[in-house]
């Protein structure tokens, strides 16, 4: 009877080992590691929760016949939680002695590299061609600034617009042909001081001839002279008329008293 039970247990172990050989992701030698407390599962991940290896595969009569201590079942869930409660996952822990020995061994093979930047002048220094620097204090640094108010800008725009309008009017006046002032000269000749009126009439006629020839300079000169003589003739004529009227009134007033 004992021989039959041992053969069955050997068949179970051989089937489990054959299944491990076909799976390359797990231990191909043995799916169970025998420890002091009994058979322990080698599946570390929780996806193998259904695989619980223990003494259940062997009949209870085998345990009683071998007089071995009671074997415990291993629950992967409790094992994973107990490890995560003390350590963080995905962290490899080493003792201080191992780390100290590694540090002593690596220190001899390490070399330190130092990067030095090029010398450049600071904001308060000035570089000369020979490579020397001169420090400048805050008093030596002068910043030229230009500021103006918005009101001044508006006034400047108004002045600029007025100047542009004046220049445009002057340009238009220069482009216009000179006037002959013929009507004013005729009035001064007939109604005012007639000698100056005749001269103004003659100059207005010369202005028309110069404009017809295209000589604008001569036409403008004749036009200015005709205007001056016509105004002077009107002024003198007006004075003569006023004087004659005053003399006549004075003469009549004397006759009335007599």
From Swiss-Prot:
Topology relative to the membrane: Single-pass type II membrane protein
Topological domain spans for side Cytoplasmic: 1-181
Segments on the Extracellular side according to the record's topology features: 203-228, 250-258
InterPro entries documented for this protein: CD225/Dispanin_fam
Keyword Transmembrane helix among record annotations: yes
Keyword Cytoplasm found: no
Keyword line: Cell membrane, Cell projection, Endosome, Membrane, Phosphoprotein, Postsynaptic cell membrane, Signal-anchor, Synapse, Transmembrane, Transmembrane helix
Intramembrane segments: 229-249
An example Gene Ontology biological process: regulation of postsynapse assembly
Cellular localization per UniProt: Cell membrane; Early endosome membrane; Postsynaptic density membrane; Synapse
Highest taxon listed in the record's lineage: Eukaryota
Pfam families with a match to the protein in the record: CD225
Record field: transmembrane: 182-202
Modification Phosphoserine, positions: 137
One Gene Ontology term of the molecular function aspect: protein homodimerization activity
GO cellular component: cell body; dendritic shaft; dendritic spine; early endosome membrane; excitatory synapse; glutamatergic synapse; intracellular membrane-bounded organelle; plasma membrane
Subunit structure: Homodimer. Interacts with GRIA1 and GRIA2.
Family stated for the protein in its record: Belongs to the CD225/Dispanin family.
Function: May regulate AMPA receptor content at nascent synapses, and have a role in postsynaptic development and maturation.
Descriptive protein name: Synapse differentiation-inducing gene protein 1
Provenance organism: Homo sapiens
């Amino acid at each position: 009877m004992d021989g039959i039970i041992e053969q069955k247990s050997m068949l179970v172990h051989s089937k489990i080992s054959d299944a491990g050989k076909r799976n390359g992701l797990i231990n191909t030698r043995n799916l169970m590691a025998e420890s002091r407390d009994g058979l322990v599962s080698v599946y570390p991940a929780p996806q193998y929760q259904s695989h619980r290896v223990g003494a259940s595969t062997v009949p209870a009569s085998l345990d009683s016949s071998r007089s071995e201590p009671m074997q415990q079942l291993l629950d992967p869930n409790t094992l994973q939680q107990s490890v995560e409660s003390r350590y963080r996952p995905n962290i490899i822990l080493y003792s201080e002695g191992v780390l100290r020995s590694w540090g002593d061994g690596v220190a001899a093979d390490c070399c330190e590299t130092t990067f030095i930047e090029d010398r450049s002048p600071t904001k308060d220094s000035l570089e000369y061609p020979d490579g020397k620097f001169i420090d400048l204090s805050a008093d030596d640094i002068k910043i030229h600034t230009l500021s103006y108010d918005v009101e001044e800008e508006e006034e400047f725009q108004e002045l600029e617009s007025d100047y542009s309008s004046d220049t445009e009017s002057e340009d238009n006046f220069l482009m216009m042909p000179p006037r002959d002032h013929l009507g004013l000269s005729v009035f001064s000749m007939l109604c005012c001081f007639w000698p100056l009126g005749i001269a103004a009439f003659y100059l207005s006629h010369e202005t028309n001839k110069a404009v017809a020839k295209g000589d604008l300079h001569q036409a403008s000169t004749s036009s200015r002279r005709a205007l001056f003589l016509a105004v002077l003739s009107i002024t003198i004529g007006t004075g003569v008329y006023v004087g004659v009227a005053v003399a006549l009134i004075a003469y009549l007033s004397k006759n009335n008293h007599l």
